[in-house]
Structure formats: C-alpha cells, structure tokens
Amino acid sequence: MFPLTEENKHVAQLLLNTGTCPRCIFRFCGVDFHAPYKLPYKELLNELQKFLETEKDELILEVMNPPPKKIRLQELEDSIDNLSQNGEGRISVSHVGSTASKNSNLNVCNVCLGILQEFCEKDFIKKVCQKVEASGFEFTSLVFSVSFPPQLSVREHAAWLLVKQEMGKQSLSLGRDDIVQLKEAYKWITHPLFSEELGVPIDGKSLFEVSVVFAHPETVEDCHFLAAICPDCFKPAKNKQSVFTRMAVMKALNKIKEEDFLKQFPCPPNSPKAVCAVLEIECAHGAVFVAGRYNKYSRNLPQTPWIIDGERKLESSVEELISDHLLAVFKAESFNFSSSGREDVDVRTLGNGRPFAIELVNPHRVHFTSQEIKELQQKINNSSNKIQVRDLQLVTREAIGHMKEGEEEKTKTYSALIWTNKAIQKKDIEFLNDIKDLKIDQKTPLRVLHRRPLAVRARVIHFMETQYVDEHHFRLHLKTQAGTYIKEFVHGDFGRTKPNIGSLMNVTADILELDVESVDVDWPPALDD
C-alpha cells in the first residue's frame, strides 16, 4: 500500500517538480514506517508518479526569492505571460525547476544530494561490505555510522520553508520535528541490507564500527552565508578542519530569521549536477582489555620504556615484554599500559605480582578461548627470564576501575636491605618491631620532583619487622600505605621525609636492595593454573 494520502499530494507534487527525490518526499510527508523507504529507487519513483498522475488540479508554486534570480525569474515571467495569453491565472509547478517529474530519476535530489538515491541501493552496500570483509576484523555484530555534509541541513531547511508556506495556504502546519530525519531514513533502508550481506546483526552497542563519510564539493559553499549572519555559531575548534560542522550549522539555522534565510538561499534549493562523493569507508574496533599480574625479577629493568631526550637508556621494559606479544596476537594498532603503582628500575616485584591492565587499541582479532589466553601467557613467560605473568585474562573497561579503587587505602609489603654508617647490634633494631601505624610526612622526593608536583603527603607505616645481618646491615620487612616512598623513608631524603629510619635509629641509613613482596589488591581474579 502506497504510504501517501490525498492530503499529501499537493506537497509531493510540489517537491517532485522542484527536484526532490521520492524518499525525501516521504520524509517531508511524515512517513515514519520503514517499508516504503526500502523499495528499490526506480520502483519507488514509478509508484510515486502513478500516485500523482491522478491529481486533477495543477499545483501553484510561489517561489520564495531564489538567488539564481535571472534564470528562474525569467522562467516565471515567461510562464505568467504564456498563461495570461491563454486566459489562465496560475503558475504551473511543471514550469519551475530544470526537471519535469517524469525525468526525476535522472537527476540528483536537491535536498539529500543523492544520499537517499544511489547510496541506498544494493550496489553501494556491496561495495561497503567488500571493504569490511577485506579489513580483516573479527566481528559478530556491527554499528554503522554515517557522516553527511553539513550543507544538507541548509537544503532541508530551505525545502521545509517552501513546504511550510504551501501547507499554510491550506491552513496546515509542518514543524521541523515533523520531518523524518535523514539519518533515520537512511538507517531504515541500509541496516537490513548490511545485516543480510554480512550475516551479522546491526547493534548500536557493538564494538565494531563501520563508518562512511560523504562530501559534496559542488555545494560546499551553501553554508557560508550563515557565518556572516550568525558569526557566534562558527568558532574555530581544535581537531576540526572546518568551522562548518553539522552542529554549528544547525545552531545557526535555529537562530536565523526566516526572512534573512530567504534573502540568501534559494527556495526551493537548486538541483546539483552530481551526487555526493564517498570520502572514506573506515572500519574500527573498540578497544579490548587484558589484565593480569606480573613479577619482575631483574634489578636492571624499568616498568616502562626508559627514554631520555630521545635516547633509550635500557633495551627493554616490563611493559614491552608483555605488550609486544599481545599486540601481535590481537593484531592491534597500539596499546596503553597501566598498573597498580610502579617500581623503580632496580626494584624487584615478587610474591603474587603487581596487577596490570593493557588497553589494546583497534584490535583486528578479539575472540579467544581461555586455553588460547593461557597459551599466550606461557609464550610471554617463555620469552624472558626477567618477568613472569600470571592470571592473564580478558576484562571489561569497567573492571579496570577495581585496580585503581582505594589507591590511597590499599597496602603494600616490602623487604629492604639496610646499611648503617654506625656499627649496630641486634638489640639496636629490635625497637622497630614494636612500632605500629607510624605516621610520616613525605615531601615530594627530589628524584621525582621533575615529574610530580611539590607537596607534603601523609603516609602510614603499618608495621615493621627486622632481621639482623651484620654490624652494618639488617633486613627490614614492612607493610605500608600505598604511595609511600620506601627509599626516602629509609635515608630521609635530606630531611624531606620525617621521621625516617635514620632519625629513628640516630644513624645515617641507606637502602641497598628493595623488593615488593605484595600488592594487596584483590584484582584481577586469580585463575587456576
């Protein structure tokens, strides 16, 4: 059943004769169910022409001050003269515009610039799908997004003013919200075709996105007059190649007075010579996240690449030893590494290890069995004796928040080998065992002042346990609040950490070795070996 009614004929004939395609006509007539839009374009045009052939009265078009004045005004004057000689007093729509309705299938829509014509047909859908299949991405669903030229909003505004005026003659109204949005109509037509061609559902929450960007160089200046009338709407923004974004154009159209618009832009809009061009067809997959715990056994390995003034100081890092394997297997473009704290280059991380997470950006492969992840973990562990990884698993973006939760409240356990300048006996260190929840103030250490703001941070040493080695050495086991600088707690950092081991013992103390024994974060979940 054809979706238009007798009430729509006036508007449909008007739009068709001024160069508007059938699908845009449906939009302006408020057709909000999908089926009619999905008909093949030629069939749709034939059905529309059949529907309009039953119209008995010619429609009157009152052209609203179009800029290409000389051509169209001359056409109108000639039409009026011819009609007056025949004793008729009305202007036929068929005399206005460059195209009669029967030839509309040869012309580009003056509103959508071909978007709802050529780019809704199966040939174009197949072209996009071929690009998707050649991209090499794994996906079980997709979200399809399009970017239309901003001048489409200007053209739609002009067509709306035209239709609104004509409907006003019949005491009818047409609000902007009554028009079906171009993107909505485009989705109604294309989504089922994409889903059928690729064999997967269209899902707005899918991590795999196919995006198509359209442009129309021929009409790119359609928006420019708005900048002169509404300059506040068009301000340069970072990462934007043009000030004429869709949002800026819509803001200006909502602000501009109708009479000002009509002085500057043809109504109805001119028919273009060519359809839109496809600037790009891109595929991208949302990031996936891998988490685990790592042990670091080397005292000559930084957590992240150590590069100063463009020069690499050490050949590798914990981050690289793990991420290189993940990048290769997930076929990702890049990654972001994060962890629950960090250790210095000369500090080992023992026990159950330190929690970490890696964000893999735009991965092409995303589906793995638990066995495949276990094999990947083994591959990482076999590749180096400097680190080991455990509990490797895929996690969600939201789950990574657990790693950072309670950053100040969580605790860490350390083991340090201490040197003292004065000779000591076992009894000289035993009093440290009795100290509980010692509060200290730490001014930002000198060694990190270049990358951390100057501040005094209150920290807590929950307990200490000593182990005598010889008259100048003892081992100190301690549990502290996360974020405590252990080296500075031992040597005092020139008095910037108070109290410290040196001040408590009334000696000069320094730290020779430091190991992280545990990071007390219950994440990620432990896995069976």
From Swiss-Prot:
Keywords: Coiled coil, Cytoplasm, Isomerase, Metal-binding, Mitochondrion, Nucleus, Phosphoprotein, tRNA processing, Zinc. Changing T484I: In a colorectal cancer sample; somatic mutation. Disulfide bonds: none annotated. One of its GO terms (molecular function) is pseudouridine synthase activity. Zn(2+) binds at C21, C24, C109, C112. It is an enzyme of class 5 (isomerase). SUPFAM superfamilies: Pseudouridine synthase (SSF55120). It holds the Pfam family Pus10_N_euk. Interacts with components of the microprocessor complex DROSHA and DGCR8. This is tRNA pseudouridine synthase Pus10. The lineage of its organism: Eukaryota, Metazoa, Chordata, Craniata, Vertebrata.
